[in-house]
Regions:
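Compact, glycine-rich, soluble single-domain proteins
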Residues: 31-165
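Bacterial N-terminal signal peptides that target proteins for export
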Residues: 2-17
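Bacterial N-terminal signal peptides
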Residues: 15-25
Length: 165
């Protein structure tokens, strides 16, 4: 009788174990997803839902003509190779913080509260692979600063200071 009970339980146990494994794998994949960037530093952690700008056309358009940006949203500019980018705010209607990121995911510079419509160049400095644009003032509010770390699957995970899990 006990053998029968154990035999009947095996499929249920296996199904439960498989379901738990699927949930665990899904959760692990959700940790690092192309539509999010995670940032961390001594101040804590933050996550932003991002649109990706990884072509010349998308990078040129950026966040121009947007009347608002959700508090936890941004745009992630991704370059094919490290570069020395320069941004401006022409046709940009909202103030933005620009977070410049090196190939390891380390933040090298934060330009706070870029002024809407200002055509003054905003240099990112050398060795920039990504730039995260978020609402103006958000970096200061959260504590995002030079030395903070960004996690995203498009970084080379072997070089990343905070690799995807």
């Amino acid at each position: 009788m006990i053998r029968r009970m154990i035999h009947r339980m095996k499929p249920r146990v296996m199904a439960s174990a498989f379901a738990i494994l699927l949930i665990w794998v899904s959760a692990a994949q959700a940790v690092c997803n192309d539509i999010y960037v995670d940032l961390r530093g001594p101040w804590g952690q933050a996550r932003f839902a991002v649109e990706i700008a990884d072509t010349d056309a998308l990078r040129a358009q950026g966040l121009m003509h947007r009347e608002r940006l959700a508090r936890s949203a941004g745009m992630l500019f991704i370059y094919d190779a490290p570069t020395e980018p320069s941004f401006w705010m022409r046709n940009t209607l909202i103030p933005l913080d620009m977070v410049f990121v090196d190939p390891t995911g380390r933040i090298t510079r934060v330009h706070a509260n870029a002024i809407p419509h200002d055509t003054t160049p905003i240099p990112g400095g050398p060795n920039v692979l990504m730039v995260l644009e978020i609402n103006g003032g958000m970096a200061a509010l959260l504590g995002i600063a030079e030395g903070s770390e960004l996690r995203h699957p498009r970084l080379n995970q072997r070089q990343a200071v905070w690799p995807c899990e």
